[in-house]
């Protein structure tokens, strides 16, 4: 390739923030739940580069074809590869693509095709655009991808803080705020903020794991009822203080079934395959979380409060889709 920017190229990163920044100098975009990917195109040669510099072409052949369908022959894009089903981003389906079997990748590309959503233009033709302010790069990006009406998507953007706030309550993963006058800084956490969408759910406490210290609880395993009235595991909550870990065992005592397990097709489990002990489905907690994969909370949830006013059967799986 003879592009003005060479690979590998580190993407610009964002710092975490709790709320949307205010002021005329900010622009806002929705946060996507996919694989951050830098796209290099020089004629018929397209290369997809992951956030950590690894090649991604073999996992997403349909994205390569989407880039080749763009009129622009020489460019470098920053964006995200995503899989959407019925308007919902499905990170678990996306993750299944990272597999050594080419036949599996080809099948998944047909069944659940991925798409590329562009949110920055880093080079066009012989011109590197890193030094240009974000607002100018954005305008040029709109032209290159035909406002997202072509084969490659264009992330929405607004300078209206109130309008951006909708992305903290809708189907997106949150908001990325960018300084409109800032250049693109590869590998730097500057001029960009990420504000995650924090969701809450009321969950049944279906089991627990013991803590490292005797007589303590390490985590609570959470469940929600599906349409068939089955209690399905959706994740866990931990991070309790030392005093709370000791008090929890007393609170759970009268609900213990003494059924134990460490995984299996129909048992409560986590990636760590730690031993759990079952509980009667009678206790309800409210938790906060920010990511889901399918019907599971992808990262550990945060405990908010006990819900003595809530019946376990009111804790439905549909909460994870709202």
Q: Residues of each region from the PLM?
A:
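Catalytic cores of nucleic-acid ligases and guanylyltransferases
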Residues: 1-322
């Amino acid at each position: 390739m003879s592009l003005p920017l060479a690979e590998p190229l580190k993407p610009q990163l964002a710092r975490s923030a709790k709320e949307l920044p205010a002021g005329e100098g900010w622009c806002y975009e929705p946060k996507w739940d996919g694989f951050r990917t830098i796209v290099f195109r020089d004629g018929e040669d397209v290369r997809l580069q992951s956030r950590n510099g690894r090649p991604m072409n073999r996992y997403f052949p349909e994205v390569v074809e989407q880039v080749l369908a763009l009129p622009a022959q020489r460019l470098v894009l920053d964006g995200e590869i995503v899989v959407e089903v019925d308007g919902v981003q499905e990170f678990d389906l996306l993750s299944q693509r990272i597999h050594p079997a080419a036949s599996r990748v080809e099948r998944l590309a047909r069944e659940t095709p991925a798409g590329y959503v562009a949110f920055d233009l880093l080079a066009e033709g012989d011109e590197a655009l890193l030094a240009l302010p974000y607002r100018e790069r954005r305008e040029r990006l709109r032209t290159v991808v035909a406002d997202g009406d072509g084969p490659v998507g264009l992330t929405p953007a607004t300078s209206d803080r109130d309008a951006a706030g909708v992305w903290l309550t809708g189907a997106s993963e949150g908001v990325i705020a960018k300084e409109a006058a800032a250049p693109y800084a590869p590998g730097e956490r500057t001029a960009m903020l990420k504000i995650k969408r924090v969701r809450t759910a009321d969950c049944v406490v279906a089991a627990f794991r013991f803590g490292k210290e005797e007589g303590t609880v390490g985590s609570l395993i959470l469940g929600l009822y599906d349409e068939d009235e089955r209690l399905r595991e959706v994740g866990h909550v931990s991070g309790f203080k030392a005093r709370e870990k000791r008090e929890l065992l007393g609170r759970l005592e009268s609900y213990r079934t003494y059924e134990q397990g460490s995984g299996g097709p129909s048992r409560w489990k986590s990636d760590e395959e730690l031993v759990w002990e079952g509980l009667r489905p009678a206790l309800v907690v409210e938790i906060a979380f920010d990511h889901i994969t399918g019907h599971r909370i992808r990262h550990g949830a945060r405990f908010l409060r006990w819900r003595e006013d809530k019946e376990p059967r009111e804790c439905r799986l549909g909460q994870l889709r709202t």
